[in-house]
């Protein structure tokens, strides 16, 4: 979370908040796993905020946000049983993953669970492109909030990025 790749994790938290608000009262509420202790705490807080925004505070269970493992492979080993055993309806993978994420997508495929995935790691993007039903390629990971209409700040950030790109292009010319 505190590394240079923490932005992908923060984008994943924004997606988690959006999904929690919309699915908190369903028969299959969200379950979130994290591969970093600080991110696991933020995951629990994001889940709680999503339940509060949906006026479903009484349905929130702190155990639905968890640390599945602090290293890449221990994270995958802890996330695979969640997909397989906890009766999830969709598998959303957003954050800083390596190619080992293929093991989670395989577990989802075996459980007939659709996968949406996005990461900032190029080899993992290639894996998700091949294995996920809905891969997010490149900066789509960071634009996912705007795609879903999660708020005006997401749309504004994309507009600012586009303006800065055009200014950089004009400067280079």
Where are these regions (language model features)?
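Well-ordered alpha-helical segments embedded in enzymatic catalytic cores
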Residues: 15-18, 75-78, 143
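Gly/Ser/Thr-rich loops at beta-strand to alpha-helix junctions
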Residues: 2-10, 36-40, 94-101, 122
């Amino acid at each position: 979370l505190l590394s240079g790749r923490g932005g992908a994790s923060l984008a994943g938290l924004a997606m988690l908040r959006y999904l929690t608000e919309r699915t908190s009262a369903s028969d299959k509420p969200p379950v979130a796993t994290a591969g970093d202790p600080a991110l696991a705490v933020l995951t629990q807080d994001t889940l709680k905020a999503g339940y509060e925004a949906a006026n479903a505070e009484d349905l929130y269970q702190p155990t639905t946000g968890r640390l599945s493992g602090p290293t890449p492979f221990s994270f995958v080993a802890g996330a695979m049983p969640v997909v397989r055993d906890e009766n999830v309806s969709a598998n959303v993978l957003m954050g800083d993953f390596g190619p080992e994420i293929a093991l989670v997508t395989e577990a989802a495929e075996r459980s007939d669970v659709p996968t949406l995935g996005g990461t900032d790691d190029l080899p993992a993007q290639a894996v998700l492109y091949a294995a996920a039903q809905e891969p997010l390629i490149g900066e789509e990971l960071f634009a996912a909030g705007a795609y879903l209409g999660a708020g005006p700040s997401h749309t504004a950030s994309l507009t600012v990025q586009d303006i800065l790109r055009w200014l950089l292009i004009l400067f280079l010319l």
